[in-house]
Amino acid sequence: MVPPPPPPVDAHPHRLFPTEDPPSPLFPIEEKYREDPDRLVGDGGAAPSCVGHERRGLLTDDGENGECRPAEIHEDEIPPLPALNSSLVMLVVTSSAAGFLFGYDTGVVSGALPSIRHFLHLSPVQEEAVVSSTVAACFLFSLIGGHANNTYGRRPVVLTAAAIFFVGAVSMGVAPSFGWLVAGRTVVGAGVGLSSLTAPMYVAECAPSAVRGRLVTGVSAMITVGQVTAGIVAGLLTGKDGGWRYMLGLATVPSAVMGIGFFFLPESPRWLAASGRTAEASAVLTKLHGPTPTAAAELSSVLAAVEFDRDPAHPVGPLRALVSAVSDPPTSRALRLGCGLMALQQLCGINTVMYYAANIYEAAGFGESAAVWLSAATALAQAVGVIGSMLLVERAGRRILVLCSLAGVAVSLLGLGFSFRMARVSSGMVTVASDECSSQPALVWSGITETCYDCVGINECGYCGGLCVEGDETVVFGDDACPAEAEWAFDACDNPNGWMSVVFMVLYLLSFGMGMVSGCLD
């Protein structure tokens, strides 16, 4: 008896769809459209641990030990870089504006706070409210943004965020009081929360696969560009009449750029496909990618992902999806690693340093103008760290850069704390204090005005020749008079160790910048 001939061998056994029944000859899903060989992949075949990866159309397990394995990609299978067109350029510019807005808001508040404190006579608690109101609103609206994105689409959410940010920036620029300023900061936080969540998602769903990772990372990198720009603007406007209003109000420019840009951009193809508008999704991908096979493959991947989400066997809704991800070992490990890195980045104090950089430098002994310019310089150090990380990540590896970043952050924070201890030790002693300046409101110290460091920490109080009395930036109030040879210190005390604070602040932000991008790329 002659044995039957063997079945034909499929050249691509790990296709998302079986070769004998492809969904359409126009949209083949091939392994060559994968862009990152370092990702763990699988198609939900023999290995239970690979279930769920088929939505990306990637390879399956190795067939031996039931684990996902990296995809093997030949050099000639890497998708070519897409040709630039007006839609792609608009996508890059407008998505970058979202990151720029976030960075500008962070940096400009640091430079504006010293001027706002003197103009509106803010207490330390009120200063904290000016900063934290934006952060709280950002957190709340980032949670709301997920539902809004799924319901209304990415484009309307970003347009709404741009409009909200514009209104908030105008409100801050004309704020006549503390309450008005906090309200404007809260409105801005709502815009930041919506845009910072939606813009990277929109880029990931619209950008060609060959440059998708770079564009998404670019949105994060633009945060540092916004911080540096804000520092320069604050330095130029510090000391000018109403300068802090212009600092805050100029945020209308990038918000207008983002709003106008997204007005002319199409909706996300992923959202269109999920809404049953497949023809529109195809037209959007063709517009962004050009009429190439890559556009067809991208549409096929989008349709496969949408079909996966609609499958009753797969979890629907954020809670069920999270439970499913946590119960899947490879996904759970990746989730713990990613969330852990992000938590470490936030817990190391980056928000405190960025929002209060100018205040920190004032406490270290620098005047208002010098403190604002130094905060711009340290923001530039973070930008250098980000750029250096992007250049070195493929050579040194992500793990090495993240470990070096964390070590540098730890050393710099310890050094920064030591430098402030030295500043207090070397501060001039108070021999006489007026009734208005005889107590330190901060609970960090003993509650007694003992040093120049304590004195200048009290609103409308300054130090000269052992006296702690009321005054302003230039003169002493009342009958108190400084000794002729004494120098009036209102914003900061003379500190021979101030250079230490500068060194450790620069090291801190340089180290953080290295880990900021490396952690995201990991």
Regions found by a protein language model. Name each.
Residues 295-307:
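Short, well-structured alpha-helical segments
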Residues 2-289, 307-522:
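Alpha-helical transmembrane bundle of multi-pass membrane proteins
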